[in-house]
Amino acid sequence: GAKKINAIVTKIKRIEDQKEQYKLDSRDLLKWIAIKTEEMGKRNFSNSLEGVQNDFKGFQVFSFSEKPPKAKEHTMLQVTFFEIEMKLKELRQPPFVPPEGQRISDIEQAWRSLEKEEHLKNTALKMEILRQQKLEQLAAQFNQKIGLRNGYLDEMILVLSDSRYGSNLSNVEASFKKHQAISADILSRENRFKDIEKKMGYFEDENYHGKGGIKKSGEGVLSKWKHLLELLSKHQQKLELDTEMLAHLRDIDTVHNSVISLQTSFDSEEFQKAANIEQSMQKLNLYESEIKAIQDSIKRLKSQGKQFSSVKGPISENIEKNVNKLEEDYKQLSSVAKTTREKFEE
């Protein structure tokens, strides 16, 4: 009898040792699961393609090296628990109740939570790798476009900065048409430069690791674009002004031709030696009304010409010179008309 009791006591002691081991092992495993579940829930990935690929390698070390031995521990805990249960049943002892939170169902639930977080992290890492790959592709395309835009801008700035550009005064109309064609070509590209601004914003929003370089090169191009538009506007204004001044010069010439034509009429033998004084007076009245109209035209031309007085250059010099000559010839014509009337009225 004593031998049998000793055997039972020994068995119970072994079971108690197993229970203690279960408590220790389950506590350690649950602690590891809690730490790893928290780690799996974090999304503090590196902000570059290479960095996030290394993050993924680190994650795979967890999945394929660190986790499998713990999965084995998890299985062994289940085996130990059922062994204890069987032995207690054999000895007709009450069932084993692990401490609160350390039951098989608790461990199972914690393990499932860990695997769920692991799956979510795996998906998130793969998505982040794809996002970083896309950003790298877009950055390469952006830099290629920056190169093209820079080439175009440098070329056009060179063209518009040339001192000979639009300076063909013998044919301002041709220069203006050429400028309009160049202007249309430049302005048709405006959306390409708006797109650069949009892309810069995109890289900023996506927190691309190279956004600083993108911003610097993008701003460089946009600054050149602004400079090109300023040059374009400056030439546009100058050519418009040249066109206006040439039209004004043509108006002066037209009035001047009228003065010369009238001068010729006064000098003509037909007028000077007219037999019929009445007929000559009629012609003189007509000429005088024309002279009055010329006087009004000169006033108008001088008033319009004031806007060009501050402009430097050969066209404005010609305007001043031609107006002076026109006034001089007009005074002479007026004097001839006055003398002629006095002669006729004697």
Where do the language-model regions lie?
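Extended alpha-helical coiled-coil rod segments
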Residues: G1-E346
